Amino acid sequence: VSMLHPRRAFGSALLYLNESNSVARAALAKVRAHLKAKGVRTWSVVGRTGQDALRRAELAIALGGDGTMLRVAREVAPHGIPLLGVNVGHMGVLAGTEAAGIGRRLDAVLAGRFKAEERWMLSTEVHRAGRRIFGPELALNECVIRCGEQARAITLFTRSGERFVADYFGDGLIIATPTGSTAYSLAASGPIVD
């Protein structure tokens, strides 16, 4: 997923929000008005986006916290839509633009003055007895595979494409991207992982 991607001017934007956050709802009105004044067509999204809107969008803006960013990244990444996060939530590591400075940030983005960050994503499928039972699903942070609600040991045979990786015996497996491993490291008072 591209957190921002320098390219042609942005003429349309999908505006995603965490609808349970009243600050996000207020920020949505401000962002929509600012973009409209700049001639950018917008669509507000609550829940999942229709395929037609995803085909037409040139930019996605997530108004919420990091949880909103993770949800929106899964949806827009397959379409190559760049994503800007506006932090109006509790955690704003990924959603790096603060709501108070959104007007200036939007002006910079629309003028092409920004630094793009490309992020790795995981695509996960679970197969049992040769049949896919889950996936493919995208993840920006991590994928967690476990047996179910009750912890018990299982054997996991892991592959990357057709290539064997390893067999694991335990109660589950966490596979993290650099973005996800940084979150785990920071939670343990560790460093940022590149």
What is each of the regions a protein language model found here?
Residues 20, 66-68, 91, 179-182:
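Short glycine-rich anion-binding loops that position phosphate/pyrophosphate groups of nucleotides
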Residues 25, 67-73, 181-187:
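Short glycine/serine/threonine-rich phosphate/pyrophosphate-binding segments
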Residues 71, 75-89:
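Gly/Ser-rich helix-loop-strand patches that form or flank binding pockets
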Residues 91-171:
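Catalytic core of DAGKc-family lipid kinases
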Residues 167-194:
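Gly/Ser/Thr-rich active-site loops/lids in small-molecule metabolic enzymes
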